[in-house]
Each structure stands twice: as C-alpha cells, then as structure tokens.
Amino acid sequence: MHKLRAIAAAAIGLAAVVIPVAAGSAHSNRAANDHGGHQIKHVLLISVDGIHQSDLEWYISQHPGSELAKLVHKGAEFSNARTSDPSDSDPGGTALMTGGDPRATGVYYDVEYNHDVFPPGTTTCTGPAPGGNAIYDSPDDKLPAVPDFLHPNPSDPNFQTFPSFDEGGSIFPGGNDTNPGLIMGLSPHPQSGLNTATFPVDPSTCKPIMPWDYLKVNTIFQVIHSAGMRTAWSDKHAVYTSFNGPGSGGASIDDFFGPEIDSQAVEPNGTPYPTDTDWAHDDAATKQYDGYKVQAVINELNGFDHSGTQQVGTPAVLGMNFQAVSVAEKVDSPSTLTKNADGTYTESPTELAGYLPGTTTPGPLLSSALDYVNAQLERMVDTIQHDGLAKSTAIIITAKHGQSPQNPLLLKRIPDGPIISAVNAAWTAKTGDTNPLIVAGTDDDLWQSYLSVKTQDAANFVKNYLWTHPATAQLYNNDGVDRGTESVAHSGLAQIYAGHDAAAFFGVPYSDPRYPDVF
C-alpha cells in the first residue's frame, strides 16, 4: 500500500478543509497521519475558485445544516492557508497540483513571457533566443474563433467570436454547439484540440513546448499514475492538461475533462443565452457549465470514465474546480435558468455580483452560487456514501484563488493600456529606441511587465514611471450610483519590485527568464 499525504493549499483568508468522509469523530487537532482507523484509497480534490475563509464562515453560520457545515465540523479546517503569489487560476491550479509556488514550478500566470524561448510559430531557431510569449489559455484552441450563434454575420455590429466548447471540433463540427449535453463525450485526452503553433518554442529542439512540459516540477498525477493508480481531473480549459507534468507526454491524467469555458454559453436546448456571452460571464450559465464537470466527477466516483459509458474503476485522485462562486463575485448577471412548459428557458433578472456595498456579506447572486456549490458537494458525498467509498475516501475543499477586493466600494478600475503606451513613449523619448519597452504582461489586481531590454536600468525606468505618475480610476458604479472617478497615486499601485528586487521577491536568480521584470 502506497502511503499518500494530502496537502491542502488555499488563498490568504481562504478555506481549506480536509475531510475523511466517514470520520464523524474527526477533530481539527487530529494528528496528520491519523485517519481514524480508515485506509484512504481515494482523494477527491475540489477547488471552489474565489471562495474566502469569511465566505465559508458566513455560509456555515447562515446554513448550519448545510453540507459545507457538516464537512467542516467533521474534518480538519485550515483557516490561514495561503495561495500562490501571483494568485489566479494559474499559477493557483499548478500550486494545488504540485505543492510549488512560481519559484519552483516556473508558472507565473497563464499569460506570461519567457526571455529564453523563441516566439510561438518559430520554425527556424538560429542565434540566441529572443524571448517570446508563453500563453497557455483559451487562445491555444484549434477552433479559437467560432462566429457568434446569435450574430454570425461579420457586418453585424454585435458580431463576435468564441473558441469552440469542445476546443477542436471533435464533438461539434465547426464549433456549432446545438446540444451542449453532448460535451460529456469529450475525449479524456483532449490535446488534439490544442493549436501548438500558439506555444513558445524550445531553442534546443525548435519545437513548441507543450503545456505539461513547461512545468519545472512533477505533479500529483504523475506520482499517482506512476504508482499504477488511476487519475482524473476536470477543469475549464484543455490547456490545463499542463497538470500532467513534465516528461509525461500528457498521459499521467488518465481522464481529463475540460470543456472550454470561454466558448459561447448555450442553454440545454441548444439556444444561446440571451446575454450573448461565454460561460464565465453569466452565473446561470456558469452553474450549467459547472454541472457538466460535477456529472463527470459523479460518473468517476461510480467507477466510470467522465462520460459515464466506460467502466474503469474509481480513480485514486480525482476532482474539479467550481467557477460559479468566482463568477458571482465579479460579474453582474442572472442567477438561475428555469425550464418552461414548452421546452424553452427563461433567465432570472440580472443581480449585482459580489458583496453588499460597504460589507463583506455575500449579496443574493453570490449567496445563490454558494447554495449551488453546497448542493453539488452534497450530491458527491451522497454518491460516495452510496457506493461504499466513505471509509476509504478523503475530500479536500480549497480554492485556487480568492477575489479582491471583497468590499465593492473599494474597487477602483484603472485602464492599463494608456499607462503601458505612456511608459513605452517615455522610453522612446529617453533612449531613441522605437521598440516597445513593455512587450508582455498581465494587469489584473496586480501589475506584471516583461521588458524587451532586460537590464536593471530599464526595470528601474518602468518602476519610477509608475511610481511618479497618477492614474484615473473608475469607482464602483454597478449599483447605479455614479461615484465618478478618482485620481490615484503611483498608477494605483502600492508596492513595485523591479529587476533584482523582483527576482528576490520570487526567490529566483536575476538571470531566471520567467519571472516578470517589474511586479
């Protein structure tokens, strides 16, 4: 019997709960190696993306008989766990699968840059690698631009495109999704839906670096698979097959289920959602989307593959991420989809996302999302109990990341495009170099920039510009109250690390090619 140690990691102030399902006598002070006499053979890992420790505490206080309350009271709760830094779906997901932070894994974001690779699409690798984008996200799909089902004419002012729900057209030819339930038949190895021409190119082989080979350390799936046990995972992009780990050939996750969340949201009857958006910008749609992954997990707990058609045995490690809470924290949208007698569907009215203004109390939309997650966890636990797996299964509930700020009145939105353009223009004026200084980066609730000139002087230039220039922020107005704009100092930033300081912050050598030059 292989002894396995379950490690839960979560964001600052997030919930991390480890529960041996049948251990009714479990206490939070139980020794780490004490499983109450039960031999754990299966671990169900659940990431409730976006959930905070305060959300968990609030929900349990309001719903003391809920499944979340039962699991917390029967398990060990870690209330001061920390996420990766930076914190987002990735590197947060990679942290859960490896136990590593970006220093160890080499993954800083799903959209980043590497100074030691050739740009995507390079076929002739001569001379030193100039650096290039390292993007492992939905643009990597083979069908990245399916025309809008509601507005398919490019001349329509509302025309837009989405990646295909099945990534590469394996279920829906041309990405024409008229029956989203068919997604359950998605391949357990969806790598064929990835467009390798979008990946950075390895200078030593002049070949694209596959997502799993970009990781610098192995993953839990590699360990378990190598030990002869079955593995499964469900997530929002096929590119998250990166969790297979380096050198795996993408084969250490036996059953990966990754419907593309950035595809156009379609109601169960094949009608596009009236909000005309993707699965991540309408919480009613997000719940439908999460439901496919929940069904995949239940099928796997029942001993089948994610489609429920092949009997393969219950995986030793399996799980999924929930998106409903994360979306309900940040996107004003309907919360429910109701089926009508004639087979059509009706969405509820749009509700405000996040928390009640001035508080960290979940508003109705977020409360509904927490209810949804709780109900799906109850389904999973019921399945575990019904299948006789309770004495041999542990559940880990955690989060890849949180969402900030919780109090919506603290939210200040600052467009980054004008700032980047101004930095590049100032650099040209100073040096005469007409090439953009900032060539890549991600600016979310943080700022990270990669520079075309990797010197301390260039990094200091960006830092000094950001610190000495104000920016205009749009204040929270989702509730209909026009609070106007506000001039914020230091480009809206609180702390800036540049060059050697950025390397020291992440704990890597200055010569490391992956960390952001300015953070």
Predicted regions: what is each one?
Residues 29-76:
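Active-site-proximal N-terminal segment of extracellular/periplasmic enzymes that hydrolyze or transfer
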Residues 21-31:
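Signal peptide processing junction and immediate N-terminal pro/mature segment
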Residues 371-414:
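Metal-dependent active-site segment of extracytoplasmic phospho-/sulfohydrolases and closely related
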Residues 100-101, 105-345, 474, 486:
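His/Asp/Glu-rich, glycine-adjacent segments
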Residues 179-181, 186-200, 213-218, 227, ...:
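Active-site neighborhoods of enzymes that stabilize oxyanions during catalysis
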Residues 9-20:
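Bacterial N-terminal signal peptides
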Residues 1-11:
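Bacterial N-terminal signal peptides that target proteins for export
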